[in-house]
Every structure is written in C-alpha cells, then in structure tokens.
C-alpha cells in the first residue's frame, strides 16, 4: 500500500463509522488464512497511532536511509532534544512577521548566490477561509518591510544575515545580500500563492523566485516544491 497513511486507514473513526476503502481493505486482509499487508509512506505518524486492536498498527517497521538529496526524519525528529532548525510559534512574539523576514533573508542568500527559487510553505488549516487569512497577514507583513525598508526591516535583515550558515554555497557578502533583499521588496518580486481546491496554481508559479505558498492537504500530496525551506 503506497502512501499507506492517506486513504487506507479508517478516516471516519471519530464518527464511530468505517470508511469505504478501509472496509474493503479489511475484507481483503481478513479473507485469507495468512497474509502480509505492507504499508509504505514517508509520513507514518497516523499509522503508528493506530491501536493494535484496530488491525492497522504495524507489527514491524523498516526505515530506509534518506537519499543524497533528502535530510531524512532523524534530522527533524532526533531521539533527544529539539533540532536547531525548529522554532515553536508559541515562543515567537510576532510569528508571521518573523517567518516573512526569515524567508526573505534566506531567499536573498540563495538568489544572490545563483540559486533559482526559495519557497516557504504555510499549512495552517484545511479551511480555505484560514488560507485567505494567512495570505492577507503575509501581504501585510511584506508591506511593513517596504514601509520600514531603511529602518527596522534593515536591522532585522542584518540580524538574520549573521544567523545564516549556508552549506551548499558560499555565504554572499552583506552588501550583495542586502541589495537582493531590497530588490525583492522594492520590485514586488515576492509572490503569495494560495493553493487549495478553490484556486488553480500552476507549478511554474513557484519554480523561480521568492514565494510564500499557503494551503491545506493539497501541499502534501502529489506536488513537489523546489527549494522548500520553511
């Protein structure tokens, strides 16, 4: 079962009902005297949370090492402690502004060093109204960056520069970095895209440049975002 956490589990369990796909798979699993049901996924959380009584909790787990272009689960979920790349929103005074400034900073380093794209993904909810709310917040914070270009924004972007530690490319000079950051906000070169069942977004729209992409489950199924950084 490829992407075994998507449709195979009982998605109606909280309503005391059984989803059709889960019911049919149960019939297949239980219809033979012996069988192996192999579940494959890169996001196994829902499978691990199944009870043994449900028949959907794995009896064994095999973990594949990540390929050369992937960081792997251990990078984001170490056995102890909090990874340095993770920040909890509850601990940030203005989380949306912080994310916008950080992404502009990272995008400036990438684009100034010859990179093509820097994408930032927002998955706040499955509700489309929430997607619009966050898109408006991001646009508001970008406008703040423009209004405070030579003041607070410049101070914040300089602080972020000192925190950058790129590993694939050399760190560009501060002047190059700042010039690119100003280009992004002055030239209205930052895209804010909503991706859900209500909007039609082409992959070419997030293949280049500095982008914020907001959506729900659409972001995690059948779509690949190049240069996905946060």
Model-based region annotation:
Residues 1, 5-6, 10-112, 119-121, ...:
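Conserved P-loop NTPase catalytic core
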């Amino acid at each position: 079962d490829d992407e075994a956490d998507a449709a195979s589990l009982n998605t109606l369990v909280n309503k005391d009902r059984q989803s059709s796909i889960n019911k049919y798979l149960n019939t297949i699993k239980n219809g033979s005297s012996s069988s192996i049901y192999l579940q494959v996924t890169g996001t196994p959380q829902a499978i691990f949370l199944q009870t043994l009584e449900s028949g959907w909790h794995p009896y064994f787990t095999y973990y594949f090492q990540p390929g050369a272009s992937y960081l792997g689960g251990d990078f984001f979920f170490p056995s102890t402690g909090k990874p340095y790349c993770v920040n909890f929103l509850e601990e940030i005074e203005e989380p949306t502004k912080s994310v916008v400034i950080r992404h502009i900073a990272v995008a400036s380093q990438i684009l100034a060093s010859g990179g093509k794209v820097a994408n930032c993904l927002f998955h706040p909810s499955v509700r489309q109204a929430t997607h619009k709310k966050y898109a408006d917040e991001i646009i508001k914070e970008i406008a703040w960056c423009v209004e405070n270009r030579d003041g607070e924004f410049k101070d914040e972007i300089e602080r972020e520069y000192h925190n950058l530690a790129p590993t694939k490319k050399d760190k560009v000079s501060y002047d190059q970095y700042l010039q690119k950051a100003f280009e992004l906000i002055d030239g209205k070169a930052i895209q804010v895209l909503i991706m859900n069942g209500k909007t039609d977004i082409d992959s070419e729209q997030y293949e280049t440049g500095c982008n914020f992409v907001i959506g729900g489950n659409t972001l995690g199924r059948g779509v690949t975002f190049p240069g996905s950084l946060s």
